């Protein structure tokens, strides 16, 4: 089709031990939680997530082709201008029928009546619920239910809002909003309000998955939309009822770039839960930060993580001097409430009183986009135009990212993670190019 594009691009099969199912869920937000901010172009009306869930490999599973990576019925961003965006549009037209490698089947149930862990993922700027599908789907293939958020704070590349509470109203598109000056005072206000907006979305998504676990439905009173028909989603939600670990202090929060900064914001937040009489940050057991963008962390003076945290840094971001120096300073902050003057360097990485340690790893040859599907799907020529020059094999980068992420969960006692114990994935200089740097 010209320009070196291929219409046969495929996403890799998820490499964990279990097949994976998926659906998109959009839930109306209760009126009292429909927050709005001056810097964000619309009120929070719905919350939209892609849910990845593990399936039982001993039962029949059928491949599906209906969960599309680039749903064209939602459009290509109208805001896109200039050669770089034109190139992306042209390439995207070759992905019209690209489907996620997911299946229809029965939910996996851990042995001994165990419950499935729940993992919430927040995307970065110009991301979406689908852009990190290989990462999120592979995490799910280890027996974890993953909620991939689609944020409506003008940070997603494009998002369509369909409010099922008002079906008579036409859907509308939330466009990506460029930041013209990252260091302006107005940008600090924007970053803060975006993070508050994202936190609200994550709170509502968390309550939604709790409702599924407790009631077998996302909400008993509010309507919702799904990417599958009612017989399909009712079967999925009923199978999840009573089988998810949604207890306070047992959830995992993760994100890429601005999504990783979102995790830091939640960790340091003094916001109460919308639905419970405790602080929202106490919902989480541990965190995984992929290429955290430190500018909003520094601008908003966010404290170090309260939870055991794995950080995976791309080679590109390690060479991003301002960001990496800010990360080093943040992690060894001597004023952190859980650190003492006599601590060793490794102990200064501990951000909880129980001496559970964080890890910071880098994989040689990777770029900022390596946490996403883009290096797999975009030709090298396109990434070169977009200034994404990578040397690492994108499939191998995905494998080591997910192996280390899953092993980190095992080592922090997240129960019922499937697959073999893999301690080498959190050791330095055993896997070529994989190095612990702090």
UniProtKB/Swiss-Prot annotation:
GO cellular component terms, semicolon-separated: cytosol; nucleus
EC numbers on record: 3.1.1.47
Subcellular location per the Swiss-Prot or TrEMBL entry: Cytoplasm; Nucleus
Gene name for this UniProt entry: plg7
Pfam families with a match to the protein in the record: PAF-AH_p_II
Similarity comment text for this entry: Belongs to the serine esterase family.
Origin superkingdom: Eukaryota
Name under which the protein is recorded: Putative phospholipase A2
Chief localisation class: cytoplasm
PANTHER family listed in its UniProt record: PLATELET-ACTIVATING FACTOR ACETYLHYDROLASE (PTHR10272:SF0)
């Amino acid at each position: 089709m010209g320009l070196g594009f291929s219409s046969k691009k495929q996403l890799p099969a998820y490499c964990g031990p279990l097949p994976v199912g998926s659906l998109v869920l959009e839930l109306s937000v209760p009126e009292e939680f429909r927050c709005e901010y001056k810097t964000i172009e619309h009120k929070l009306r719905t919350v939209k997530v892609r849910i990845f869930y593990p399936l039982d490999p001993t039962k029949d599973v059928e491949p599906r082709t209906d969960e599309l990576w680039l749903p064209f019925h939602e459009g290509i961003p109208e805001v896109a201008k200039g050669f770089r965006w034109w190139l992306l549009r042209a390439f995207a037209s070759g992905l019209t029928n690209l489907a996620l490698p997911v299946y229809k089947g029965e939910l996996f149930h851990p042995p001994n009546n165990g419950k499935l862990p729940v993992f919430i993922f927040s995307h970065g700027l110009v991301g979406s619920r689908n852009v990190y599908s290989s990462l999120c789907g592979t995490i799910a293939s280890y027996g974890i239910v993953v909620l991939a958020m689609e944020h409506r704070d003008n940070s997603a590349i494009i998002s369509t809002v369909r409010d099922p509470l008002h079906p008579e109203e036409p859907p509308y598109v939330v466009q990506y909003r460029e930041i013209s000056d990252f260091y302006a005072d107005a940008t600090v206000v924007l970053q803060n309000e975006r993070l508050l907006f994202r936190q609200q979305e994550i709170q509502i998504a968390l309550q939604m998955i709790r409702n599924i676990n407790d009631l077998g439905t996302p909400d008993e009173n509010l309507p919702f939309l799904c990417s599958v028909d009612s017989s399909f989603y009712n079967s999925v939600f009923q199978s999840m009822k009573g089988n998810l670990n949604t207890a306070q202090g047992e959830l995992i929060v993760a994100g890429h770039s601005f999504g990783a900064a979102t995790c830091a914001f939640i960790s340091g937040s003094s916001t109460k839960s919308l639905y419970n009489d405790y602080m929202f940050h106490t919902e989480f057991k541990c965190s995984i930060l992929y290429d955290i963008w430190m500018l909003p962390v520094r601008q908003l003076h966010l404290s170090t993580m309260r939870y055991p945290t794995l950080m995976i840094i791309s080679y590109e971001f390690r060479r991003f001097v301002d960001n990496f120096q800010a990360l080093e300073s943040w992690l060894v902050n001597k004023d952190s409430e859980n650190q003492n003057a006599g601590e060793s360097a490794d102990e200064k990485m501990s951000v909880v009183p129980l001496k559970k340690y964080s890890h910071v790893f880098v994989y040689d040859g990777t770029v900022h986009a390596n946490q996403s599907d883009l290096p797999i799907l975009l030709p090298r020529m396109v990434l070169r135009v977009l200034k994404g020059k990578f040397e690492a094999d994108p499939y191998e980068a995905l494998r080591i990212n997910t192996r280390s992420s899953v092993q980190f969960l095992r080592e922090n006692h997240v129960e019922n993670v499937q697959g073999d114990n893999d301690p080498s994935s959190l050791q330095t200089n055993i896997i070529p190019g994989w190095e612990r740097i702090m």
